[in-house]
C-alpha cells in the first residue's frame, strides 16, 4: 500500500490482513504452533490472526505509517488452523514469521517478538506456544552448545554408557569444606559428576570462591585415586553478567572441566554470553531449568518445554535437565523423548504423537545431553538406561546421598547398577522386562547395591502426567 493512496483510519478485523490460508511457507520462515483458546464469540480465524498480528507488525488500529513500509514483506501470517481433538474451543493456529523480523543470534529477541506481548491479549482466554520450527538460515546465526556430545565424551574419555551425576544435598546450609567432602565421597565412589543445586550461588554460609576452591581440590583428589576424569558443576549463576563471567573465569583458572548456569532465571542474554565464554575457554556448560514449570506446566497457557529446549540448544549448553519419565518430576514418556531427540539429534521428523509439530533440521549445531534428575534411585536404572540411551546424564541426588552407609557406597551402588544394565543391554537382554532381575543379580556381588535395593524397594512417585497431547 502506498501512502499516497490515502489512509483509512479505523479499526479493522485482524483476519482481513493476517489470516492467509493460501500462504505457502518459505524455507526461511520461522514457524510457530500456538494452542489458542479464544474468548466466547471470537472466531478462531480472528484469534489466530490476532496472534500473528500482535507478535509481528500489527497493532489495534490502522496507522498511517503502515504506508511507509511493505506489510506483505514483514507481517506474520496465520496460515492454518486445526481444532484440538478432545478439547472444546481450543485450536492449533500455525503462524509463519518472515526471517527479517528477528535479530541474528539472539534468542532474547526471538522470544520478545513471538511471545513478548501477545499472551496478555484480551480476545484470548489462554495461549500456549507448542512448538517452533527454526530454519537453518536462522539457527546458523547461533554458536549453539559450547562443545556438544562428542567433544564432551572425548574430553572426559567416557564412552558407551550414560554419565552419572549427583546433586549435593542438603542443598543449602553446608560449609564449603563439608560441601567439598560430600563431593569427594561421591566422585571417589564412581560417579562422573557432582552438581551444585540450582539455588547454590554465593550465600552467607558458603561464598562461591570458597566452594570453588574446596570442590576443585576434591575433584583432583578423586581423579588421582580413581584414574578417571571427574567434574563438579560449579554454579556460576549470579546477580549480574559481569559477576557470572568472573566466576566462570575463576573455574577455568582452577582447571576444572565444567560450570553450570540456571538459564531461565539467569536469562537468555546471560546464558548466551556464558556459552560463548565456555567455548572460547574449553569449559563444558551444564544447564539447569529452574523456573521452567512456571512457564510450561499449564496445558493451555504458557510455552511448552520443547520450545525452551530448542531455545537452549540455540543459546548454548552442553547438558540440560529434561525430566525423568520415572521419578518425582513431571514428564510423560513419548513427549519427553520427543524433546530429548530435539536436543540430541541433527534432524527430527514431524511426529504429532510425540508432540513434534514441525520437522526440525539443526544442520550441524552440536547436540545437548539430556539430564534425568529428580526422585530416581537404583531400581529405576534399567528403565532410565532403556529410555534415555547412552547419550544422557543420570543424576541421583537423594538416590546417592540417601544410601544407609553414606555417599561413597551410594555412588558405588549407582555405578554398579548402571554397568550391570549397560552390560545386560549389550548382551541383548530386555531391560524393560528383566530390569528388576538384572539389578537383583548385580546386588549379589555388590553389598552396596544390595543395601540400596533394600532401602528403596517400595518407593514410587505415581501421579497421572499433566503433560498430555
From Swiss-Prot:
Molecular-function GO terms, alphabetical: magnesium ion binding; monooxygenase activity; ribulose-bisphosphate carboxylase activity
Gene Ontology CC annotation, any one: chloroplast
Predominant location category: plastid
GO biological process: photorespiration; reductive pentose-phosphate cycle
EC class: lyase
Site (Transition state stabilizer): 328
Binding site for Mg(2+): 195, 197-198
InterPro entries documented for this protein: RuBisCO (IPR033966), RuBisCo_large_chain_AS (IPR020878), RuBisCO_lsu_C (IPR000685), RuBisCO_lsu_C_sf (IPR036376), RuBisCO_lsu_fd_N (IPR017443), RuBisCO_lsu_N_sf (IPR036422), RuBisCO_lsuI (IPR020888)
One Pfam family named in its UniProt record: RuBisCO_large
Entry binding sites for substrate: 117, 167, 171, 289, 321, 373
Keyword entries, A-Z: Calvin cycle, Carbon dioxide fixation, Chloroplast, Disulfide bond, Lyase, Magnesium, Metal-binding, Methylation, Monooxygenase, Oxidoreductase, Photorespiration, Photosynthesis, Plastid
Cofactor or coenzyme needed: Mg(2+)
Catalysed reactions, semicolon-separated: 2 (2R)-3-phosphoglycerate + 2 H(+) = D-ribulose 1,5-bisphosphate + CO2 + H2O; D-ribulose 1,5-bisphosphate + O2 = 2-phosphoglycolate + (2R)-3-phosphoglycerate + 2 H(+)
PTM statement from Swiss-Prot or TrEMBL: The disulfide bond which can form in the large chain dimeric partners within the hexadecamer appears to be associated with oxidative stress and protein turnover.
Active site residues per record: 169 (proton acceptor), 288 (proton acceptor)
Chain positions with N6,N6,N6-trimethyllysine modification: 8
Cofactor, free-text remark: Binds 1 Mg(2+) ion per subunit.
Compartments (UniProt record): Plastid, Chloroplast
EC number(s) on file: 4.1.1.39
Modified residues (N6-carboxylysine): 195
Extra information: The basic functional RuBisCO is composed of a large chain homodimer in a 'head-to-tail' conformation. In form I RuBisCO this homodimer is arranged in a barrel-like tetramer with the small subunits forming a tetrameric 'cap' on each end of the 'barrel'.
Subunit description: Heterohexadecamer of 8 large chains and 8 small chains; disulfide-linked. The disulfide link is formed within the large subunit homodimers.
Family: Belongs to the RuBisCO large chain family. Type I subfamily.
PANTHER family noted in UniProt: RIBULOSE BISPHOSPHATE CARBOXYLASE (PTHR42704), RIBULOSE BISPHOSPHATE CARBOXYLASE LARGE CHAIN (PTHR42704:SF15)
Described purpose of this protein according to its UniProt entry: RuBisCO catalyzes two reactions: the carboxylation of D-ribulose 1,5-bisphosphate, the primary event in carbon dioxide fixation, as well as the oxidative fragmentation of the pentose substrate in the photorespiration process. Both reactions occur simultaneously and in competition at the same active site.
Protein name: Ribulose bisphosphate carboxylase large chain
Gene: rbcL
